[in-house]
UniProtKB/Swiss-Prot annotation:
This is Glutamyl-tRNA(Gln) amidotransferase subunit A. The active site is at K76 (charge relay system), S151 (charge relay system), S175 (acyl-ester intermediate). Allows the formation of correctly charged Gln-tRNA(Gln) through the transamidation of misacylated Glu-tRNA(Gln) in organisms which lack glutaminyl-tRNA synthetase. The reaction takes place in the presence of glutamine and ATP through an activated gamma-phospho-Glu-tRNA(Gln). One of its GO terms (molecular function) is glutaminyl-tRNA synthase (glutamine-hydrolyzing) activity. It catalyses: L-glutamyl-tRNA(Gln) + L-glutamine + ATP + H2O = L-glutaminyl-tRNA(Gln) + L-glutamate + ADP + phosphate + H(+). InterPro entries: Amidase (IPR000120), Amidase_CS (IPR020556), Amidase_dom (IPR023631), AS_sf (IPR036928), GatA (IPR004412).
Length: 483
């Protein structure tokens, strides 16, 4: 049963080939057996999951139907889950039990999803390797000596290892798409404002967006159908009609105009990965697409701009973790200042502290104009580049990452080397457009992904192209050995 995709599970449950309880029990046994070697889960909610599965089976028996009714999933551990620890993979929130469900959690539960637990990640979603977690690094099931990507690495590893058919993630600079690429999954970052951020613990509020990781575009469409939509509790959530993502999957690609940005194929890209991207392009041409080269000139400034804006917002967002209201509190503080200093100093990990300091510096009076204001101007230029490009093409295609997965600890001493792994993904967050990564082959036995970018609220187009490509290829069906 663990080999079934979300869509196959939906069909199996509807045909009464198995029950949600049977499926959940099988996956929980698999998590207990295999996850110690991967460390993808922080919290497994076995009792709650079986309770939800029994309720889903009862709803089906009473005549209710629904594609996700009784389907198992798991949540990245920055989505608040009522009565269950929500840690953000940080010592500072190690004992935080959320008093409410995030909107994403609430909507998937209403659709009948069974949550098997909370997934490991980079601390406060800051990282590209899932190595900075207070609970230890996550391992990539394709090679357990390698990272699974980040920050949604636990989500990616758990789905790739068939511990759970699909998972939620969040994407601030590539944190859904990059781990999806490194673990042979399909990962979607929706348009900023398409999915509610209410109850999703913030890293950088103008960049964060929740989305699905799954084994196919069809599975992502199923999840996004339940997750998307206006939420009055989130002031950044856009009141825009939700497309029929499942119906859109089957559109032919004849006449689709694809743009290849010349800036994506320069120095720093593994040439074997470039070959995989071009093979994908040839496949899409066979399906009726046309391809042309385009320019995104401001992309060269994206990483410096992102690493000013994101830490600046993080320094503000993370100021709430002060040892007073909730979360970790140091022992025997000598004064209020000592309480703040020691609670934060002992509670946050090295990468989080690094980004808080960078962000505070960028926002300080003497440097605000030189750094933060300039970064926001670059952000506007990047957005203008995309708006211009989408007047010429329907979709932009390129590599998701410059390299396949690297070894655990390899980039630990060089934060900038890790930051450069996000070079192709962060522009979508800065512009707010949707992006999807899909499996496109292997380099040295490790998966690589192709990224698709579309205009605002065109998630259905991304899912359509990915689904048609997945009908013509079988990369996405390949599983890591032993899983």
């Amino acid at each position: 049963m663990h080999r079934l995709t979300l869509a196959q599970i939906a069909r199996g449950l509807a045909a009464k080939e198995f029950s949600s309880v049977e499926l959940s029990e099988a996956l929980l046994a698999r998590i207990a057996e295999l996850d110690p070697g991967l460390n993808s889960f922080i919290t497994v909610t076995a009792e709650q999951a079986l309770e939800q599965a029994r309720a889903a089976d009862a709803r089906r028996a009473a005549g209710e139907s629904g594609a996700l009714l009784g389907a198992p999933i798991a949540h990245k551990d920055l989505f608040c889950t009522k009565g269950v620890r929500t840690s953000c993979a940080s010592k500072i929130l190690d004992d935080f039990i959320a008093p409410y469900d995030a909107t994403v959690v609430e909507r998937l539960a209403a659709a009948g999803c069974v949550s098997l637990g909370k997934l490991n990640m980079d601390e406060f979603a800051m990282g590209s390797a899932s190595e900075s977690s207070h609970y230890g690094p996550v391992r990539n099931p394709w090679n357990t000596e390698c990272v699974p990507g980040g920050s949604s690495g636990g989500s990616a590893a758990a789905v790739a290892a068939r511990l759970v058919p699909a998972a939620t993630g969040s994407d601030t600079g590539g944190s859904i798409r990059q781990p999806a690429a490194l673990t042979n999954l399909t990962g979607l970052k929706p348009t900023y404002g398409r999915v509610s951020r209410w109850g999703m613990i913030a890293y950088a509020s103008s960049l964060d967006q929740g989305g699905p990781l799954a084994r196919s575009a069809e599975d992502c469409a199923l999840l996004l159908s339940a997750m998307a939509g206006f939420d009055p509790k989130d002031s950044t959530c856009v009141d825009q009609p939700v497309d029929d993502y499942l119906a859109a999957l089957h559109r032919p690609l004849a006449g689709l105009r694809i743009g290849l940005p010349r800036e994506y194929f320069g120095a720093g890209l593994d040439p074997r990965l470039s070959d995989a991207v071009m093979a994908c392009v040839e496949e899409l041409k066979k399906l009726g697409a046309t391809v042309k080269e385009i320019g995104l000139p401001s992309m060269q400034h994206a990483i410096p701009a992102y690493y000013v804006i994101a830490p600046a917002e993080a320094s503000s967002n993370l100021s709430r973790f002060d040892g007073v209201r909730f979360g970790y509190r140091c022992e025997n503080p000598q004064s209020l200042e000592d309480l703040y200093k020691r609670s934060r100093g002992e509670g946050f990990g090295a990468e989080v502290k690094r980004r808080i300091m960078v962000g505070t510096y960028a926002l300080s009076a003497g440097y605000y104009d030189a750094y933060y204001l300039k970064a926001q101007k670059i952000r506007r230029l990047i957005r203008s580049d995309f708006i211009g490009a989408f007047q010429e093409v329907d979709l932009i295609l390129g590599p998701t990452t410059p390299n396949p997965a690297w070894k655990l600890g390899e980039k630990g001493d060089d934060p900038v080397a890790a930051y450069l792994e996000d070079i192709y993904t962060i522009t979508a967050n800065l512009a707010g457009i949707p992006g999807l990564s899909m499996p496109a082959g292997f380099v040295d036995g490790l998966p690589v992904g192709v990224q698709l970018l579309a205009p605002y609220f065109q998630e259905s187009r991304l899912l359509n192209v990915a689904h048609q490509y997945q009908q013509a290829t079988d990369w996405h069906q390949r599983a890591p050995e032993g899983y």
